[in-house]
A protein has these predicted regions:
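Short glycine-rich or small-residue beta-strand-to-loop segments that form or flank ligand, phosphate
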Residues: 107-120, 170-172, 206
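Glycine-rich phosphate/diphosphate-binding loop of Rossmann-like nucleotide-binding domains
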Residues: 118-140
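Solvent-exposed alpha-helices and their adjacent loops that cap or buttress functional pockets
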Residues: 60-62, 100-104, 161-165, 179-181, ...
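A contiguous pocket-lining binding segment that forms or flanks enzyme active sites
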Residues: 134-182
Length: 261
């Protein structure tokens, strides 16, 4: 192997991105053509695979949390993909059911939404919530039942949080899959959720997956953002994620649950 080839091989081991693919004549090696086809199929599957809401509910309930399963106004996947606006609104019967279940005001509502990758929420939602629970306990925050929604967009959390009288809502949603990331989970935090909030009023934690941000790291960031959001009364472009500064401070490693002092 030549020096440039060896360099590309070493770089390729550090990222799932499609780099250093090599050549076979004027085209790509057969191995890379097959890998591309597999990645494309995995991305399509991530978008079109139905979310197993009941299975997710069981995994969340195993953590000791109550759940509610709801639906958006998109009746099926085809409509959801063609009409994003339907995915941002609760079905009337789901809105009524949540309203009946709403209790006293809470600090946080959590919505698990399939988004564009059911695989991401199947694999990542419960581990993220489990990693976040020690932060919840330490801060003394009270939670609404975890809501699970099919055919859902980020903005559906605004209605959910408003109905449940939450000071903030965190939407755990499957992100649009790429050719190397069909399993990426995103977290969108919004203070004062209500219909009509814009994306500029949200904070996003992206790329939560085995090859990206770990559940523990994502939970740490969410804890920092939520604490600051509740203190300052805002989220979005006016709230910058400075959790890394806190983590770099002396003794900050103890802020990660399970970290040794």
């Amino acid at each position: 192997m030549s020096a440039p080839d060896d360099l590309w091989a070493r770089l390729a081991r550090l990222t799932p991105a499609r780099i250093g693919l090599g050549r076979a004549g004027s085209g790509l090696p057969t191995r890379e053509v097959l890998r591309f086809g597999l990645a494309h199929a995995q991305a399509r599957d991530a978008v079109h695979t139905p979310m197993e809401a009941e299975a997710i509910a069981r995994s969340v309930e195993a953590l000791g949390l109550a759940t509610r399963v709801v639906a958006s106004q998109a009746p099926d996947r085809a409509t959801y993909l063609r009409r994003p606006d339907y995915g941002r609104r609760l079905a009337p019967e789901s809105a009524d059911a949540l309203a009946r279940a709403a209790g006293a005001p809470v600090d946080l509502a959590i919505l698990i939404a399939d988004g564009l990758s059911a695989r991401a929420v199947h694999e990542g939602a419960a581990p993220l919530i489990a990693a976040f629970q020690p932060h919840i306990a330490a801060a003394g925050w009270n939670l609404a039942p975890v809501v699970i929604a099919a055919q859902a967009r980020v903005a559906l959390g605004d209605a959910v949080g408003s109905i449940l009288r939450a000071r903030a809502v965190a939407v755990l949603i499957g992100e649009r899959p790429g050719l190397s990331s069909p399993d990426s989970l995103g977290i969108y935090l919004t203070f004062g959720p209500r219909p009509g909030r814009s994306d500029a009023e949200r904070n996003c934690i992206s790329n939560v997956r085995p090859a990206g941000l770990s559940p523990a790291e994502a939970a740490f960031k969410l804890n920092w953002l939520l604490r600051e959001a509740l203190s300052r009364g805002l989220t979005g472009v006016n709230l910058k994620d400075e959790s890394e500064r806190f983590l770099a401070a002396p003794g900050a490693a103890r802020a990660l649950p399970g970290a040794e002092s």
